[in-house]
A protein has these predicted regions:
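Metal-cofactor-dependent catalytic cores
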Residues: 1-183
Length: 183
C-alpha cells in the first residue's frame, strides 16, 4: 500500500497528537540481514553491538572514519501512527525495519538531540542525525511518503523516526513504554 499525498496530509494532525511521554512500544523488529525481518517479543540492546544479531554491527549504512559502525544509528524508533499509515502486515513491501515502533511524539520539539530515553531497562540517546526516509523508504512506500518526510516544515517533525545510540545496556519488551529521562 502506498499512501496518497492527500492521505498523508490528512493524517498529520493524528500523528502529531501522539503521547509526548510514556509512549507504548507496539512492535519490535530485528534485521538479521538485508531485507530480513523477525518480530520478537523482546530485544536486548547493548552499547557494543546495538542489537545482538542485527545487521547494524556488520552492515551499517553509516560508518565512523575508522570503519566501525556509527553508534548514532544503532537503534531507530518509528512512530506507530506513521507505520500504520504506510505499511500493513499484509503488504508485499517489507516492514521498514525499525527495531522499535512506539506511539510517541518523535518531533525535535519533544525529543531534542541528546535526549535520554528509558526504553525498558535500556537507556538510549537521541541522535542529531536526521532520518530522511532513504531510497528504500521511497521505493517501498511511494514517492509521496518520501516527499512528505522532507516537505518544508516536516523535517523537525521526524516523521521517518529518530536514530539513537545505546547509552546503557538493557532489554525492551513489547509491554514497555518509552519515557523521557532528560531533555
Amino acid at each position: 500500500m502506498t499512501p496518497t499525498a492527500d492521505a498523508l496530509a490528512k493524517a498529520l494532525p493524528h500523528i502529531l497528537a501522539a503521547p509526548r511521554d510514556a509512549g507504548p512500544v507496539t512492535c519490535l523488529c530485528i534485521r538479521p540481514a538485508r531485507n530480513q525481518r523477525a518480530f520478537p517479543d523482546h530485544l536486548t540492546l547493548t552499547r557494543a553491538e546495538g542489537i545482538p544479531g542485527d545487521r547494524w554491527l556488520t552492515d551499517p549504512w553509516l560508518r565512523l572514519p575508522d570503519g566501525r559502525p556509527d553508534p548514532r544509528i544503532q537503534i531507530s524508533i518509528l512512530a506507530s501512527r506513521v507505520l500504520d499509515l504506510v505499511w500493513h502486515p499484509t503488504d508485499t513491501a517489507p516492514h521498514p525495519g525499525d527495531p522499535i515502533v512506539a506511539d510517541l511524539d518523535l518531533s525535535e520539539a519533544n525529543l531534542p538531540d541528546g535526549t535520554l530515553l528509558a526504553v525498558g531497562t535500556a537507556v538510549l540517546r537521541v541522535s542529531s542525525l536526521f532520518n530522511d526516509g532513504c531510497v528504500k523508504w521511497k521505493a517501498r512506500y511511494g514517492s509521496g511518503a518520501k516527499d512528505w518526510v522532507v516537505a518544508p516544515g516536516h523535517p523537525t517533525l521526524r516523521l521517518r523516526g529518530i536514530l539513537c545510540a545505546v547509552e546503557r545496556d538493557g532489554m525492551v519488551r513489547m509491554s514497555d513504554t518509552i519515557r523521557k529521562i532528560s531533555g
